[in-house]
Amino acid sequence: MATKHGKNSWKTLYLKISFLGCKVVVLLKR
């Protein structure tokens, strides 16, 4: 169960970073 939770948190962190990256790209393109 601990490993599952760790994977879940890692996935959330990855999604957050990806979202921020997309935002930065949009701002730079503007």
Curated annotation (Swiss-Prot):
One record GO biological process: regulation of cell shape
Subcellular localization, as worded in the UniProt entry: Cell inner membrane
Gene: aapA1
Entry similarity comment: Belongs to the AapA toxin family.
Identification of the protein by name: Toxic protein AapA1
Anything else known: Addition of an SPA-tag or GFP to the C-terminus of the protein renders it non-toxic, but detectable by antibodies. As Helicobacter ages cells change from a helicoidal shape with multiple flagella at one pole to coccoid forms by 70 hours in culture. As they age peptidoglycan muropeptide abundance alters; GlcNAc-MurNAc dipeptides increase while GlcNAc-MurNAc tripeptides decrease.
Chief location: membrane
Example of a GO cellular component annotation carried by this entry: plasma membrane
Source organism: Helicobacter pylori (strain ATCC 700392 / 26695) (Campylobacter pylori)
Annotated effect of mutating Y14A: Reduced toxicity
